[in-house]
Amino acid sequence: MLEGCILAVSSQSKSNAITNNSVRGAPNGVSFAKLREPLEVRGLLDVQTDSFEWLVGSRRVRQAAIDRGEENPVGGLEEVLAELSPIEDFSGSMSLSFSDPRFDEVKASVDECKDKDMTYAAPLFVTAEFINNNTGEIKSQTVFMGDFPMMTEKGTFIINGTERVVVSQLVRSPGVYFDETIDKSTEKTLHSVKVIPGRGAWLEFDVDKRDTVGVRIDRKRRQPVTVLLKALGWTNEQIVERFGFSEIMMGTLEKDTTSGTDEALLDIYRKLRPGEPPTKESAQTLLENLFFKEKRYDLARVGRYKVNKKLGLNAGKPITSSTLTEEDVVATIEYLVRLHEGQTSMTVPGGVEFAVESHDIDHFGNRRLRTVGELIQNQIRVRLSRMERVVRERMTTQDVEAITPQTLINIRPVVAAIKEFFGTSQLSQFMDQNNPLSGLTHKRRLSALGPGGLSRERAGLEVRDVHPSHYGRMCPIETPEGPNIGLIGSLSVYARVNPFGFIETPYRKVVEGVVTDQIDYLTADEEDRHVVAQANSPTDENGRFTEDRVMVRKKGGEVEFVSADQVDYMDVSPRQMVSVATAMIPFLEHDDANRALMGANMQRQAVPLVRSEAPLVGTGMELRAAIDAVTWSSHKTGVIEEVSADYITVMADDGTRQSYRLRKFARSNHGTCANQRPIVDAGQRVEAGQVIADGPCTQNGEMALGKNLLVAIMPWEGHNYEDAIILSNRLVEEDVLTSIHIEEHEIDARDTKLGAEEITRVIPKLSDEVLADLDEPRIVRIGAEVRDGEILVGKVTPKGETELTPEERLLRAIFGEKAREVRDTSLKVPHGESGKVIGIRVFSREDDDELPVGVNELVRVYVAQKRKISDGDKLARRHGNKGVIGKILPVEDMPFLPDGTPVDIILNTHGCRVVLNIGQILETHLGWGAKAGWNIDVLAGVPDWASKLPEELYSAPADSTVATPVFDGAQEGELAGLLGSTLPNRDGEVMVNADGKATLFDGRSSGEPFPYPVTVGYMYILKLHHLVDDKIHARSTGPYSMITQQPLGGKAQFGGQRFGEMECWAMQAYGAAYTLQELLTIKSDDTVGRVKVYEAIVKGENIPEPGIPESFKVLLKELQSLCLNVEVLSSDGRAIEMRDGDDEDLERAAANLGINLSRNESASVEDLA
C-alpha cells in the first residue's frame, strides 16, 4: 500500500542520465567536446525526489540503503514514530506505541487539485498499540493521522491549488568544531572547541590567555575543565595519567578547588541553577539529562558520524548511540590541549592516529543539507512531542478499561504542523514557473536562510564567499545579486546528497598514473585527503597521463604540478563545478564571473515565446535540463498507439498501455503560458526515456528560451547608446519575439449581513451594449475580446438599508423585495489590461464543490494577452548583457548584407568590450558558421587548427545546431578556421569574411556601404519578463488618499506621478510661481479648489484662486496634537479659520456637477465612473 502511493515520484527521474548521444530521437547536432565523459548527468530532480522517498520509506530507497551496508533501514516517518514510542504514563503502567506508517491512494489528480484549489495529498495511517502493563492486555488499532501532501513527479507539491517547492537548507552540521583566534591584548593564539548537537545543550571548551582550560555548559559561566572530569567520576590520578603530557592541564588541575566527584557535581549545579539548593542527586540527574539521555540530547546520526570521524573513535563500526559518551568528552579535551600546544597528531586509546588541526566552519565538510524529507520530518517531530504530552495526560484521566488508541490520540498538532510548514515556512516557496529552467533551478536551490540557519543581516563576507570545497558541489557563479548574494546557491550538475546530508561530487580513480573508469563520490573532507587532476589533463588511449608533470589541486584549493603517480583522482567532466543554468552558457570560460552570474540568472527570467527555437550554439546541457524540467518522456519502450493535441498513448512492449495528458494553454504561477505539444506520430517506435512531447520553451526536447537572431555589432545614430537595442520590425510583424501571458481573474458571491450576493446578468444602470459579451449564465463568453473596464462576471450586492421616501415605500409595498436597491460589484478587467477570454471555471455549492465558509459561488476567468515585442521591453543575452529596446526600425531601414539580407538586431560595440564577456563575440561567430554551414578542405591534409576536431566536424550543413560545452568547447583558432570555411549562399558568395566581419549597407535612402566592416553573426536573444506593458501607466483623475487628499501612488492603486521636493526646486529655479502654485493646490490636495476649477472649466469661466491644501490642514492638526496653539494669520494679522471642507458652495457645485465628494481611495478605476 505504501509503494502504491509514492506514485507521484516519477520513475523517469530515476532513470539513468540522458544525453544527446543516448536518447533516440534527440536533435541532430555536432559537438566540439574533446573529452569523453565517463559519467552521464544524473536525474536533476533527485535531490528532491530521493529525499521525499526516504521520508515515506519507499522500497527503492530501502534497497539502496541495504546495498550501502545499512542494517534494517527505516524511512523518515517510521524513524520519528520509533523515537516517540513507547509513550508511558507517569506510573509506567500503560504505554502506547506507533509503527508501520502507510498511505492510501491520493484523493485527486494533480490537475484536479490545481483546478479546485485542493491539496495533492494522501491519507496517512499508522498502527497504534496500547499495552496495559498491569494486566498484559494489548489493544491495536489503525489510526488516521491526517492527509499528507505528496510530491508530484516533477518534485513539487500542490498546496491549496498552488504549486510550491521546498528548498533545501544549507546548515552547520552537528559535530565537534575546533577554532583558533588571536587575543587582542596579548596577541596569543587561543583555541576553543564547541560540541554542537542536533538537539540539546552546547558543550564548549577553551584555553584562555592565562593558559587554563575551561568549560561552558549550556552557555553558562566558565569553570575549570577538571571540574567536569571529576563530575564524570575521574580522580586526580586518572586525570594526571591521561593528561600528564600537558602543562596547561596540570596547571588547571592545581587551580581547581574541588576535591571529588560530589563537590564537582554541586559546583556545576550551582553554575547551571543559581539560587536553587544543590543536592548530589539533583546534580547527577541534571548532568545526565543534559548530555547522556536520548530524550533530552541528540547528536543525530550525522553528529555522531562527525564526532567519530574527527576524534578517531569507533572507526568502521556502525553508528548506534546518539548521545555523548565519557570518551567523547575526554578525547575532545585532549584534542584541544594538543592543538593549543602545537602538536600535529594524537592517538586515541583504540590505537588510531590522526591529524590535529583547527576547522574551517565554512568548509563543506562542516556544512550539510537539510533536504525536503528531513525538513518535514523535523516539523512533525516537534508536533508529535506535543501530542505525547496530551496522550500522557489522557492516560491518567481516562478509565483504563475504556481506553483505546483512538481515544488517546489527538491528530490536530500533526495536521497543523504539516499545514504550517507548507503554508508559512520560509523554505516552502511559491514555485518559480516563469520558464522551465527557472522551475528546475528552484528545485535545486540551496539556501543558508530559514529557521535554524543564517539571517542576511548577520551573515558576514566569509560565509558568502566562494570556498574551495564548493568545487563540484555548489556553483560558484549562480547566486542572487542583492542582499542574499552567497547565501543562496545552486547545486552543481553532477552533485548528489549522501544519507548524512553532505554534498558529494564524482571523481575518476587514478591508479599509478593511469585513469580508470571507476567512479567514486567524495565529500569535501574526503577530497581534502587526495590529490585531484582536472578533467582536461592530457591522457593517451590507455588513460595514462602523457605529461610528466600534471596540474592538480590539493587541500585548501592549492594548485601545483606533481608527477603523474602522485595523482589520486581526476574530475569526471569540465562542467562539474557549475550549475545547470551556468552550464547552458556557451564559451563561459571567456566571460567575466560577474557577467556570467547575470547571464545564469537572466535565463530564468526569459518568457516562453509563441514559437520556441533551440539555440544554434548550445552547450549540450539543453536536452537533459528540458527532460527534467518540462517535457514528457516515455517511461517504457514501445509504440505510439494514439496521438492528439491533448494526450499521447504508448503501448509498451510488455503489453501495458500508458497515457500522457498534455497541458494546453495553462497559466503558470507567473502568468506565462504553459502549453505542451506532441512531437511523435502514431505508429512511431519510442525508447524508454525518449522525449514524446515538447513543453513551453522547448523544441524537439531541447531547452529553447529565446531566438537565434542575425546581429550586427555597431553604433547606429545613437539609438543604441549604452545598452539600448535596435530591432527590426520583422520581429514584430512575424511574431518572432511574441509571448502569450495569461491572467486569472476571480470573484465570489458571499453571504453578507444585508443578504446574499448574486452573480447575474441583470445589473442596474448598465446598457445592453455593455453586457453584450455576457452569456445567459451571467459570465463573459469564451473567445470574447475584452479591454480594461469591461465586465467579465456580473454581480450585484445588496445595499445598506436607509430610511425610505414615501414613494419608495409605495414601490416596496407594490413590488415587494424586487424594488430593493443593489450595488454593482461586477468583476471587471483591471486598468491597463486586455486580451481574449480563453477559459472559465465555475464552482458552486449546488454542485458540491468545496468552497470557503460563507462563499456560495466562485468564478474564475482566464484572459490571454498576446504581447508583441515593443519599445521599452527588455532583452538579454546568455552572457549577462541586458538592454532595453530603444527603437524598432522598418525592415527597409535596417543595415543589410551584400545579398540583401537585413539584420534583425543592432547592438552597441561598448556592450561587448567594456564588460569583459568576449564569449558573446565567439558565440556570434560560431552562430554564423552553424547557420551557413561549413566544409573544411582536408584533401591536402587536416589543417593544424582542425587537428583536435572530431571527424564529424569537418563539415556541417546549413542550419546545424552545435554544442560547445563549458571549458571543453570550440577554441578561438578553430572558430577562425571555420569562418574561413563557411559555405557560400545561393549566389555562390560568402557573406562573412574569415575575421567574422562583413560589409554592411545602409538600408536608408543612400544604400551606401558603411565605411568599415562590421561583426555579423547569429546570437541567442532572450525576451525577459520585464515588459513595458506591465510598467507603463498614466492617470488623469483617480482616487485620493483619505488623510492628505493627495492622489495615491503606483500603478496598482491607479495613482499619479509624484511631484516631489526636487521637482519643486526645479520650478522655483525657473521662477514658475503660478505653475508651482497650481501643482501644489488644485492639481493635488486643494479639495475645494478642485471642484471649483472643474465647475469653471465646465462653465467656461476663469480659473478661480486656489485655496488651502489639505496637507497644510493635516500639518496644523499634527502640531495641535502636540499641544501647540498654532494659528494662521492673514497679511493684516487677523486669524484665518481653517474649515474642514463644509463649504456650502462646494457642496452645491459638486451636486450640480454630479461629483461624489465622499469618494476616497476607490478600489478600481470603474469606481470613478
Curated annotation (Swiss-Prot):
Cysteine pairs bridged by disulfides in the record: none
Keyword presence, Iron-sulfur: no
Keywords for the protein's UniProt record, in alphabetical order: DNA-directed RNA polymerase, Nucleotidyltransferase, Transcription, Transferase
UniProt family annotation: Belongs to the RNA polymerase beta chain family.
HAMAP family with a match to the protein in the record: RNApol_bact_RpoB
Protein name: DNA-directed RNA polymerase subunit beta
Listed Pfam families: RNA_pol_Rpb2_1, RNA_pol_Rpb2_2, RNA_pol_Rpb2_3, RNA_pol_Rpb2_45, RNA_pol_Rpb2_6, RNA_pol_Rpb2_7
A GO term from the CC aspect: DNA-directed RNA polymerase complex
Species assigned in the record: Mycolicibacterium smegmatis
EC code: 2.7.7.6
NCBIfam families, A to Z: PRK00405.1, rpoB
GO MF terms held by the record: DNA binding; DNA-directed RNA polymerase activity; ribonucleoside binding
Catalytic reaction(s) noted: RNA(n) + a ribonucleoside 5'-triphosphate = RNA(n+1) + diphosphate
PROSITE patterns noted in UniProt: RNA_POL_BETA
Subunit structure, interactors included: The RNAP catalytic core consists of 2 alpha, 1 beta, 1 beta' and 1 omega subunit. When a sigma factor is associated with the core the holoenzyme is formed, which can initiate transcription.
GO terms under biological process: DNA-templated transcription
Task performed by this protein: DNA-dependent RNA polymerase catalyzes the transcription of DNA into RNA using the four ribonucleoside triphosphates as substrates.
InterPro entries the record matches: DNA-dir_RNA_pol_bsu_ext_1_sf (IPR042107), DNA-dir_RNA_pol_bsu_external_1 (IPR019462), DNA-dir_RNA_pol_su2 (IPR015712), DNA-dir_RNAP_su2_dom (IPR007120), DNA-dir_RNAP_su2_hyb_sf (IPR037033), RNA_pol_bsu_bac (IPR010243), RNA_pol_bsu_CS (IPR007121), RNA_pol_bsu_protrusion (IPR007644)
Chain's gene name: rpoB
